[in-house]
Amino acid sequence: MIKELCEYIEDNTDFTVGTDLFALSEDTDSVDDCIIIAEPSPGLADALLTDTRQVPLVAYARSTDKHTARTNAYAVFDALHGIFQVSLPVVGSGPIYLCNISCSTPYYLGLDESERRAVYAMPFDVHVTNML
């Protein structure tokens, strides 16, 4: 589902998967200006509705310029905020996901481990129903 979400972000922003938009990737040290979609904590699964779950994700925007990092974080926020009953793009032969997304506004985390890139975080929850 995270790959499909990245495709949705790519379709609705200027970011490109694998270039400056990454899913669950920590091998992005060489890329200064990028968005990383991470899954930092477990989500919720309904015992009765087995095809539905809530997945907490975070979009990290990183840049050598603090204002660029903030602008990039808000670009993802604007693409995702208020999504309701949207089908994510199918990647490969995967299932169809119908989702609702609730976002928090991006906030400044500080500098990354290299001490030269500003990082903004935007937490969001994806409420997903597997349609196939």
Q: Language-model segments: which ranges?
A:
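Small/polar-rich, solvent-exposed N-terminal microdomains that initiate assembly or binding
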Residues: 1-49, 83-95
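Short acidic, gly/pro-rich beta-turn/loop elements at beta-sheet edges
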Residues: 46-47, 69, 132
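Mid-chain, well-packed structural core segment of small domains
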Residues: 65-89
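Acidic-leaning, charged glycine-interspersed low-complexity segments
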Residues: 81-129
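Predominantly extracellular/luminal cell-surface or secreted proteins
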Residues: 22-23, 62, 79
